From Swiss-Prot:
Residues 61-121 form the SH3 domain. This is Tyrosine-protein kinase Lck. Residues 127-224 form the SH2 domain. It holds the Pfam family SH3_1.
Length: 509
């Protein structure tokens, strides 16, 4: 006997409890074929699902077969084009470009790894998301393009070999929310959410709950919609000729120079940062850029290539909504709820935790250096560039360009930049987020900020800022750097804060 509840502390699952009306014991599933034995020994099968015979085990020779999730048009010497649904055999699997052979044409070449999925597995299913966290499942389902009933199945974070169902729902009090169900495994290979009905495979489970909600918060409507992935950068293209870039639209100007939207080789949309001549040594920049390109994380803007002759160009991935400080002031940014604002802060903390783990330093962390995608994903830009600037207006604390209001006291006074001075800056960035881009220390000049900080002053709590969030800011502004929290701690607190404000899920009926 036993119930279907999850007791794992990390997961807020919908409870999967069904109790027999006669004996009042929890109902226990007995097999994985969609059947359930009851007292008179009769068999119950789900009338909403078409059951299929079990598939024979795949041949080891099929392990290197993949299916194209998207069509791909070749654009380099040596890459291989293919159509959506085409099968290919992987010949070499290394980096982000895999050598493959098309089973349709017999041709060989390199293919982008993120355009294909392993054949004879769950990966080609539009509703299956491999290696997706609970938090990222919520972000994806709440992104534009998804609606009530949009869903996905992902691998469980807490239990290896298990799965979770995440569904977008509407709550009268909270609005659009995502609810999670633990998909439980049977000993003989079947699955169930509610022990009233079991399934031989996830396909049958999805078909059943697409036909009827049957105790879930809503009927499953369609798989979570995602954008076609951007193909990886061609690995040999690092120092590129200036003529390979076409600058199309000037997006803005910052401390280091201008930023443009453009195209590389006429087909790849990129952002191009053009650095002011004399702003930094080309040799020092190239050395730093070689370090920066090793820092690859979903919360960091990807560095693709460089032009090392002055004016120096930095070519990165393009982020449709521009800088966070500007986006927060747009009509779309102003409408963001506190939950979404906190989620953006959690994303930034996640990226900075990666920088922290790699023993790197940003040195110029603020909302102007955070970029926002069209799905409201936040990524950190310009990490490491600040220390290369050779402009006295930027490097001296009296300089007009020095970001005094974001800089920790020890960095202002002694030039001591560490990951803990980045933590101070993150606390200031939090004020930018909750005020939708307001300049910190409103009404104060830079000299006044320095004088007040030396007297122990700290920025007051902004309007509409939760007290718990303000206390987190104050932790970031501790006088002694070693007393400030880690970015990993900040990430966990912000993610927990975001989850806690969603409220508790109701038990499944």
């Amino acid at each position: 006997m036993g119930c279907g509840c999850s007791s794992h502390p990390e997961d807020d699952w919908m409870e999967n409890i069904d109790v027999c009306e006669n004996c009042h014991y929890p109902i226990v599933p007995l097999d994985g074929k969609g059947t359930l034995l009851i007292r008179n020994g009769s068999e119950v099968r789900d009338p909403l699902v078409t059951y299929e015979g079990s598939n024979p085990p795949a041949s080891p020779l099929q392990d290197n077969l993949v299916i194209a999730l998207h069509s791909y048009e070749p654009s380099h010497d040596g890459d291989l084009g293919f159509e959506k649904g085409e099968q290919l055999r992987i010949l070499e699997q290394s980096g982000e470009w895999w050598k493959a052979q098309s089973l349709t044409t017999g041709q060989e070449g390199f293919i982008p790894f993120n355009f294909v999925a392993k054949a004879n597995s769950l990966e080609p299913e539009p509703w299956f998301f491999k290696n997706l966290s609970r938090k990222d499942a919520e972000r994806q389902l709440l992104a534009p393009g998804n609606t009530h009933g949009s869903f996905l199945i992902r691998e469980s974070e807490s239990t290896a070999g298990s799965f979770s169902l995440s569904v977008r729902d509407f709550d009268q009090n909270q609005g659009e929310v995502v609810k999670h169900y633990k998909i439980r495994n049977l000993d003989n290979g079947g699955f169930y959410i509610s022990p009233r009905i079991t399934f031989p495979g996830l396909h049958e489970l999805v078909r059943h709950y697409t036909n009827a909600s049957d105790g879930l918060c809503t009927r499953l409507s369609r798989p979570c919609q995602t954008q076609k992935p951007q193909k990886p950068w061609w690995e040999d293209e690092w120092e590129v000729p200036r003529e390979t870039l076409k600058l199309v639209e000037r997006l803005g100007a910052g401390q280091f120079g201008e930023v443009w939207m453009g195209y590389y080789n006429g087909h790849t949309k990129v952002a191009v940062k053009s650095l002011k001549q004399g702003s930094m040594s080309p040799d020092a920049f190239l050395a730093e850029a070689n370090l920066m390109k090793q820092l690859q994380h979903q919360r960091l803007v990807r560095l693709y290539a460089v032009v090392t002759q002055e004016p120096i160009y930095i070519i990165t991935e393009y982020m449709e909504n521009g800088s966070l400080v500007d986006f927060l002031k747009t009509p779309s940014g102003i409408k963001l709820t506190i939950n979404k604002l906190l989620d953006m802060a959690a994303q930034i903390a996640e990226g900075m935790a990666f920088i922290e783990e790699r023993n790197y330093i940003h040195r110029d962390l603020r909302a102007a250096n955070i970029l926002v995608s069209d799905t409201l994903s936040c990524k950190i830009a310009d990490f490491g560039l600040a220390r290369l600037i050779e402009d006295n207006e930027y490097t001296a604390r009296e300089g007009a360009k020095f970001p005094i209001k974001w800089t920790a006291p020890e960095a202002i006074n002694y030039g001591t930049f560490t990951i803990k001075s980045d933590v101070w800056s993150f606390g200031i960035l939090l004020t930018e987020i909750v005020t939708h881009g307001r300049i910190p220390y409103p009404g104060m000049t830079n000299p006044e900020v320095i004088q007040n900080l030396e007297r122990g002053y700290r920025m007051v709590r902004p309007d509409n800022c939760p007290e718990e969030l303000y206390q987190l800011m104050r932790l970031c502004w501790k006088e002694r750097p070693e007393d400030r929290p880690t970015f990993d701690y900040l990430r966990s607190v912000l993610e927990d804060f975001f989850t806690a404000t969603e409220g508790q899920y109701q038990p499944q009926p």
